[in-house]
A protein has these predicted regions:
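Extracellular ectodomain segments of secreted/surface proteins
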Residues: 2-54
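Short, non-transmembrane alpha-helical segments in secretory-pathway proteins
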Residues: 9, 19-21, 47-48, 52-68, ...
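Short, flexible beta-strand-to-coil junctions
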Residues: 51-53, 103, 166-172
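Short, aromatic- and glycine-rich surface loops/edge beta-strands on solvent-exposed regions
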Residues: 60, 91-105
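Surface-exposed loop/edge segments in extracytoplasmic proteins
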Residues: 66-74, 106-108, 187
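Aromatic sugar-binding surface patches on proteins
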Residues: 69-85
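Exposed beta-strand-loop-beta-strand "reactive/processing" segments of non-cytosolic proteins
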Residues: 84-88, 142-182, 190
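Edge beta-strands of extracellular beta-sandwich domains
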Residues: 105-116, 177, 189-190
């Protein structure tokens, strides 16, 4: 089943400045993504997200471990934010510097990891769903072939970490679980 993972978000970074509220995510994911039950080439990425921004024409530069990456941000109408996915050689550890570049100048923000020390691994989160939802997981196999792509995303809200574990069937249907990231307990489930 692990070979069917098309996205793992392993860390969340947050920060704000006078003009911007920003997040970044460490991810290993299929890129470009196609919801077809087959995991394509995976890339190591940092996803940048700037929320509540009145300017739509921005670039961003991220710096960590002595390496710099620059990209244009595009508007995402689902999250009402500016976003970019940057393919990187390695993922940031504890923090990164995000510089927002506009026609008015540059503004730097330190984004700090909000991943708690008691957060379980993404694979343990998947195994928790696998152990607690055996009938559902077994229904995803057809002749011993797993018929879904799996997304595992670390989420952070306030002082809490959660995992979103989603199973996409390639036909627009996603069954998802929200887990407490400290112990893998399923908090909620949703079947679209």
């Amino acid at each position: 089943m692990e070979q069917s993972i098309s996205q793992i978000r392993s860390d969340v970074f947050k920060g704000k400045s006078q003009n911007y509220t920003a997040e970044a995510y460490s991810e290993e994911k299929e890129f470009p993504f196609i919801n077809d039950c087959h995991v394509g080439d995976k890339k190591t990425c940092v996803v940048i997200k700037i929320k509540d921004c009145s300017t739509l024409n921005l670039n961003a530069k991220i710096v960590y471990s002595g390496v710099s990456y620059e990209t244009a941000l595009t508007y995402n109408n689902v999250s009402n934010s500016l976003t970019a996915t940057v393919i990187v050689s390695s993922l940031p550890k504890n923090s990164l510097t995000l510089t927002v570049i506009s026609q008015d100048g540059e503004e730097s923000i330190t984004l700090t990891s909000v991943k708690r020390s008691d957060t379980i691994s993404p694979i343990k989160a998947l195994k928790s769903v696998q152990n607690k939802e055996k009938d559902y997981i077994n229904s995803l196999y057809d002749n011993n072939v797993f018929k879904c792509e799996i997304y595992i995303r670390l989420l952070a809200e306030g002082d809490y970490n959660f995992y979103y574990v989603g199973f996409a069937n390639g036909e627009g249907k996603i069954t998802a679980y929200l887990l407490d990231a400290s112990d893998g307990k399923i908090i909620a489930g949703k079947n679209d």
